[in-house]
Amino acid sequence: MAEKYPLQAGDPCVTLTEEDIWDVERLCLEELRVLLVSHLKSHKHLDHLRAKKILSREDAEEVSSRATSRSRAGLLVDMCQDHPRGFQCLKESCKNEVGQEHLVDLLERAFEKHCGDKLTQKWWESGADGRNPRRPPGSEDNSGYTALLPTNPSGGGPSIGSGHSRPRGRDDSGGIGGGVYPFSHGGARVVGGGWGGWGESGGAGRGGSLLSGGHGGHPPHGGPGGGGRDYYGGGGSGYYESIPEPANFPNSGGGGRGGGVRYDAGGDGRLGGLPPDPQEVDDPSLSVQGRGGPAPDPPSPPLRTRRFFCC
């Protein structure tokens, strides 16, 4: 029977079929293949896998005939991938064998991770609750994308997870984007990133603003911005100069790391580029320079010299 994983109360129950679970298990074995080949003692698992009818007598003889332990373990992993119950039976065998118990935790964590990814994909593609199944959560139109976890009671984005919850803009409890830290009302980690908090309770913005970099949160009561709004990827502007300036953020200004726009104060900006687009700044007073002085320019590349050698 297929296992059911309800993502959130009130949402439709998204179900993984047996074929989905088999795909996840094969993906787990493939991802952990290098580690399993190095640590799996194949001779300890042949009897259990034969008893569970995962391997036939000929399969066990073929595994035993391999010259090295790594080749035997690799063939055993391949055979478990080809059987719908191979992953679970191999995990049971590792749990029962002395010296192989540490592999059980790795297999279970990989299974949970890829099950969550598969569930999120199916939940998004289902199109329920206004979600648009034709647009992934990194596209420009994310109006229907909501977070998997409950939203923060203070407003803004959810405390953990990713997604859009409130319209972008100067708001007392953050802007677009699900929080990536429990204390964050702002920053996002959807595909392509999102906007951090802007207002009195803005958290630390991380990631990109859909098409480009990110937008840092603004103090007071919010952490420094972890992403930089720039049009050339990566990025990290720090927090802007706060108005009014709180005691715990003295001389707080721009700065940060990454390509694109450089904010010249309060941090060590890198790779300064084009100035920010005026249409993207909701309040010009927030883009003022701080009082920490200009950031240093990136170092020049080393000079190349040509050396001549005589024979």
Swiss-Prot record:
Record carries keyword Isomerase = no
UniProt keyword list: Activation of host NF-kappa-B by virus, Host cell membrane, Host membrane, Host-virus interaction, Membrane
Compositional bias of kind Gly residues: 252-272
Which GO terms of the molecular function aspect are on file?
kinase activator activity; NF-kappaB binding; protein kinase B binding; transcription coactivator activity
Which stretches make up the CARD domain? 21-110
Compositional bias of kind Polar residues: 140-152
GO CC terms in record: CBM complex; host cell plasma membrane; membrane
Q: Which InterPro entries match?
A: BCL10/E10, CARD, DEATH-like_dom_sf
| GO terms under biological process | positive regulation of extrinsic apoptotic signaling pathway; symbiont-mediated activation of host NF-kappaB cascade
Chief location: host cell
Q: Where is this region: Disordered?
A: 125-181, 203-230, 243-311
Subcellular location(s) of the protein: Host cell membrane
Please give the function described in this protein's UniProt entry.
Answer: Activates host NF-kappa-B and JNK pathways. Induces hyperphosphorylation and redistribution of host bcl-10 from the cytoplasm to the plasma membrane. The inhibitory effect of cellular bcl-10 on NF-kappa-B pathway is then overcome allowing NF-kappa-B activation.
Q: Give the protein name, as stated in the record.
A: CARD domain-containing protein E10
The organism named in the record is Equine herpesvirus 2 (strain 86/87) (EHV-2)
| Gene this protein is translated from | E10
